[in-house]
Amino acid sequence: MANSAANSAQPNRFFGTEIEYGISSPDNPDVSPILTSTQAVLAFAHEQEEGLSGRIRWDYAPESPLRDSRGFDLRRYHQPPIVDPNAVGAANLLVQNGARFYVDHAHPEYSSPETATAREAVIADRAGDKIMLRAAQLAAEATDAEGNPGPVLKLYRNNVDGKGASYGAHENYLFSRETEFDDIVAGLTPFFVTRQVFTGAGRVGLGQIGQESGFQISQRADYIETEVSLETTLNRGIINTRDEPHADSNRFRRLHVIIGDANMSEVATFLKLGTTGLVIDAIEDGVRFDDLQLRNPVEAVHKVSRDLTCTEKLQLADHVTWMSAVEMQYEYLRRVESYDQQGDVVKLWREVLDVLADDPRKAAHLLDWVAKYNLMEGLRTRLGAGWDHPKLALIDIQYSDIDPARGLYHALVRRGSMRTLVTEEEVDRAVEYAPESSRAYVRGGILRRFGKDVVAGSWTSLVVDTSGVYRRTRDVESPGITLAYITLDEVDRFTAAECGDVLESAETVAEVVEHLRTLGAVREQ
């Protein structure tokens, strides 16, 4: 078993999250969520861009969502679409903290900026809740052309609507293109199946439409239908094969993980990202997990989610060995712990597994599903009710309410009943400023300081006007405009260490562009 990474410096494992929020309008329950999601994004855009008449456009040219890691491409066209960033269902925004905020299907989605540690990722992820909450407040304060008030919006960090629909809480991990994708599948499938014991958000109802009464660990489990798939909205797989790195495609792939739940718990989010990163480190270093393959992984996903004792055994592919989800996680921990150079992920991982092995209900201060279960079980006992009681479904949704004044998770935090890992000050700063450890620093910093000069952008590009004309006219066809095309293919470049002095002291965006030109980031047209 290889172990070189345990004794040498590992390159940063860049992380990112994508949360599709549940959305409702209590005063108008029949209104289209596509419309309300658009209203939320545009309200936030109006504030960030100071009411500019010409919105910053999302640059779709680098995107390839139908390219598959198994070597084929399902793209139906090869020209990027021309999309109005204000259109209903298509509202799209680059945020000054380096994130993307847009409408995805019928949900407002926050895609966090790239971060270099799991803790940074938790901070950036939590900043998304505050941005969403601000967007909802701004939408409610807005008025339409006739002077009618905007909608009251409620936003939830969950994955199911109770009517059969599921929406995503996706994770992203950059890894080397030299790594065989089959090794990724083999190494991560048993891990993803069993990590539910600490990543689950908890759910009332069994089956996709909750057709059976009961409680289960994961909100996402019933929607996993196959082992490997490119799809994210149907026939969902344990492993998603999308090959869209948003980086140098000759060097990197991006592992797009769709099996996870939307967590409120910072411990769960930290472990979800940190442990997965360590397993990828080990896979890239040659560690094998062939002996941990499950006989029926999809069935095991459902079985683990419904085992509230965390003790039910899963049959491995050798037809002889049986392991519980917690036992499987202990084995993963043993094989990858030497890759955790800081030791913080492994320490918390072991603590949580020890509690789950003793008595899962003792993990209520750490994990969403246990906290939610204990709240519901207490109410169920007082009412003498079954799991189909409507008040339990109400707790399910209220737990995930991102409004600190109303959400049950936030009430537990205020009471000291949930462990947190980051400070409110860190999260507040992450709303305004991009992480300093990745290219997000330049993307967000240019938006923060020179947003009026930005014409378009994406994860890997920015188009800015260095003449000063665009900030006055908001018309890219105006005479005298001089466009600079900034390429940000290298995720670990253009950090605060590399660009901070110039970016923060520059008086014009042209000065920043000149600095980036010396770093090879400006593409000449």
Segments predicted by a language model, with ranges:
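Terminal catalytic/cofactor-binding subdomain
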Residues: 1-151, 155-156, 189-201, 206, ...
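Long, low-complexity hydrophobic alpha-helices enriched in A/L/V/I and glycine
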Residues: 167, 221, 228-230
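Non-catalytic regulatory/linker segments of enzymes
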Residues: 151, 162, 167, 185-186
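Helical (often loop-to-helix) elements that flank the catalytic cores of nucleotide-handling enzymes
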Residues: 173-196
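Histidine-centered divalent-metal-coordination microenvironment in nucleic-acid enzymes
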Residues: 159-176
